């Protein structure tokens, strides 16, 4: 974060402590050296003004310490996750080879082949795997330098990182919004001796009640006729929706206007749903040749307007029969960035019972370099696999080509290049990754597709985080319940977004991560868990996700 002494109202943002993040390799000396080579996003702290008895640190110095400490922790986490991923791949490959050795009775056993690793994980990750096979961390300086360079990529142009360079009036406005939000959030943290008898601890009841308000919002407040309309969904949900309980609003849905879709035969659909013994379905009106659905429907909605800098599309994971529709949408909207937050399976490996389960997402994109797939009029080619640019996501660079009027013609009319980021997000304790994903989305002028199984829970959470963050930078003056307002804004356009209280709390936790250096008051820092690790919002949140999700991070 780059700041300016003449711009920031530092007296409103300072505090009186700094936490030392200890690491044998990636310490302050190392990161400052790296920053001089790559360019630092924060200015050097002012020199300490000392008097006869050593003096006292100024508010400006304390703020600079917190900002630099915040960025250092981000960098350390990024590199630690990246190195853990490399070690995990190496461990998996060595385990695979060991198992093959035990099962095979041969003179020569397989080894870790660089070309095979490049095919599976991309050439960049294969280089990381090679460089990581060294005896100690002290030999990994080049690896760490490459990771630091990737961490700082695109940060200089990110409004979340450079808002301190704006005009003083705008900076004061952002600082006031941060102060107001931290005050409101800390006031919702309540304390009690009864939650854990004999121990003074906090509870998050008010946050849970706020989520319940969100859940009842559209029940208590009737939508207009235009907002409640879902005509296309009602005409297509049997074949193109994973659940009829997750509607698709008509006014914000993505309409496919190329006319390339196909319609299902109503009789075939009926026979697949009911047995022949249902005689009431054999009447003349039901046996006539007819079709079901429309060609312009896909279960996806735009989320745009308000404080957002760019447009998002929240979409459900493609079904086996809607993969072509998905690529129709990608090509129509000229999307350059797809964020996939769920796992996928190979449809050919599923049995009859598994195939009937609509909770599976097929591999709708080619995963190996130079591999291609064809869906109707669209030819998708994997240009490159990059498993090292981000420590969590597998990045596939794709080329989408549309066949001309003659479907047998090998020539393509148009081409589209995009990046597909895939990660099965389950653990709610990592609050760093949304900033990396959203930073890339802000750089693009075309819509960003955010996709999970239902297109609402995880997808809506990520877009709600962006909505809340942009409220600080360019939104209207914050009154109350910023997170609630942001989620209502997203839910109005994409129904049932942010489907659980844990996802709702995750939004608060991510926003808290961003404002952390700028929270100045002692009580606010204590209530939010920024001053003491054993009490406050952060401690209670971590306990809740461990209790309810039962998932721990791999790193």
Swiss-Prot record:
GO terms for biological process: cortical actin cytoskeleton organization; eggshell formation; oocyte maturation; polar body extrusion after meiotic divisions; positive regulation of protein localization to cell cortex. The N-terminal destruction box (D-box) motifs 1 and 2 act as a recognition signal for degradation via the ubiquitin-proteasome pathway. Probable pseudophosphatase required for the oocyte-to-zygote transition during which it regulates the polarized dispersal of the cortical actin cytoskeleton, the synthesis of the eggshell chitin layer and the formation of the polar bodies after meiosis I and II. Acts as a scaffold to tether kinase mbk-2 and pseudophosphatases egg-4 and egg-5 to the oocyte cortex and thus restricts mbk-2 activity to the cortex during meiosis I. Regulates mbk-2 localization to cytoplasmic foci during meiosis II. It comes from Caenorhabditis elegans. Disruption phenotype: RNAi-mediated knockdown causes hermaphrodite sterility characterized by the production of oocytes lacking an eggshell. Prevents the polarized dispersal of cortical F-actin following oocyte fertilization without affecting the formation of the F-actin cap. Impairs egg-4 and egg-5 cortical localization in oocytes. Causes a loss of kinase mbk-2 cortical localization in oocyte in meiosis I. RNAi-mediated knockdown in a mat-1 (ax227) mutant background, restores mbk-2 cytoplasmic relocalization and mbk-2-mediated degradation of pos-1 and mei-1. PROSITE patterns: TYR_PHOSPHATASE_PTP. Keywords: Cytoplasm, Developmental protein, Repeat. SUPFAM superfamilies: (Phosphotyrosine protein) phosphatases II. GO terms for molecular function: protein kinase binding; protein tyrosine phosphatase activity. A motif (D-box 2) lies at residues 130-133. Belongs to the protein-tyrosine phosphatase family. A motif (D-box 1) lies at residues 96-99. Pfam families: Y_phosphatase. GO terms for cellular component: cell cortex. This is Protein tyrosine phosphatase-like protein egg-3. Part of a complex, consisting of pseudophosphatases egg-3, egg-4, egg-5 and kinase mbk-2; this complex is required for the oocyte-to-zygote transition. Interacts (via tyrosine-protein phosphatase domain) with kinase mbk-2 (via N-terminus); the interaction does not affect mbk-2 kinase activity, is enhanced by mbk-2 tyrosine phosphorylation status and requires prior binding of mbk-2 to egg-4 and egg-5. Interacts with egg-4. Residues 207-514 form the Tyrosine-protein phosphatase domain. A motif (RXXL motif) lies at residues 253-256, 266-269, 509-512, 525-528. It is found in: Cytoplasm, Cell cortex; Cytoplasm.
């Amino acid at each position: 974060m780059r700041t300016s002494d003449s711009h920031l109202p530092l007296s409103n943002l300072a505090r009186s402590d700094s936490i030392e993040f200890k690491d044998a390799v990636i310490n302050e000396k190392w990161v400052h050296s790296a920053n001089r080579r790559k360019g630092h996003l924060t200015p050097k702290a002012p020199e300490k003004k000392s008097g006869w008895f050593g003096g006292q640190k100024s508010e400006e110095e304390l703020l600079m310490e917190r900002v630099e400490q915040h960025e250092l922790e981000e960098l350390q986490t990024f590199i630690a996750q990246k190195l853990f991923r490399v070690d995990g791949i190496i461990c998996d490959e060595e385990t695979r080879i060991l198992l093959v050795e035990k099962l095979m009775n041969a003179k020569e056993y397989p080894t870790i082949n660089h070309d095979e690793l490049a095919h599976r994980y991309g050439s960049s990750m294969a280089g990381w795997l090679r460089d990581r096979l060294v005896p100690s961390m002290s030999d990994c300086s080049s690896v760490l330098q490459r990771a630091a360079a990737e961490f700082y990529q695109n940060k200089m142009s990110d409004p979340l990182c450079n808002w301190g360079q704006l005009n003083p009036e705008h900076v004061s406005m952002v600082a006031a919004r941060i102060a107001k939000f931290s005050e409101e959030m800390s006031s919702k943290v309540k304390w009690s001796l009864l939650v854990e008898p004999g121990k003074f601890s906090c509870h998050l009841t008010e946050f849970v009640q706020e989520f319940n308000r969100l859940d009842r919002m559209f029940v208590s407040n009737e939508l207009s006729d235009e907002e409640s309309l879902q005509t296309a969904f009602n005409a297509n949900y049997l074949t193109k929706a994973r659940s009829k309980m997750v509607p698709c609003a008509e006014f914000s849905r993505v309409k496919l206007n190329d006319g390339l879709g196909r319609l299902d035969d109503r009789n075939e659909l009926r026979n697949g749903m009911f047995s022949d013994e249902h005689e009431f379905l054999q009447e003349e009106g039901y046996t006539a040749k007819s079709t079901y659905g429309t060609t312009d429907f896909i279960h996806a909605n735009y989320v745009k307007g308000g404080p957002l800098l760019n447009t998002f599309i929240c979409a459900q994971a493609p079904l086996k029969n809607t993969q072509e529709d998905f690529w129709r949408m990608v090509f129509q909207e000229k999307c350059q960035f797809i964020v996939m937050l769920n796992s996928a399976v190979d449809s050919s490996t599923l049995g009859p019972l598994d195939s009937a389960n609509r909770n599976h997402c097929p591999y709708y994109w080619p995963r190996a370099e130079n591999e291609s797939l064809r869906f109707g009029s669209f030819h998708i080619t994997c240009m490159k696999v990059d498993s090292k640019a981000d420590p969590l996501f597998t990045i596939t660079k794709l080329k989408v080509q549309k066949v001309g009027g003659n479907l047998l013609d090998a020539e393509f009319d148009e081409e589209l290049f995009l990046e597909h980021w895939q990660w099965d997000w389950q653990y709610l304790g990592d609050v760093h990754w949304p900033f990396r994903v959203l930073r890339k989305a802000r750089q693009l002028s075309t819509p960003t597709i955010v996709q999970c199984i239902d297109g609402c829970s995880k997808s809506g959470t990520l877009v709600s985080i962006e909505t809340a963050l942009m409220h600080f930078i360019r939104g209207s003056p914050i009154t109350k319940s910023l997170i609630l307002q942001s989620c209502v804004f997203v839910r109005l356009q994409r129904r049932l977004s942010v489907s659980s209280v844990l996802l709702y709390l995750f939004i608060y936790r991510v926003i808290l991560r961003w404002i952390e250096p700028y929270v100045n008051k002692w009580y606010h820092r204590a209530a939010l868990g920024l001053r003491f690790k054993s009490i406050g919002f952060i401690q209670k949140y971590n306990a809740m996700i461990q209790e309810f999700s039962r998932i721990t991070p791999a790193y």
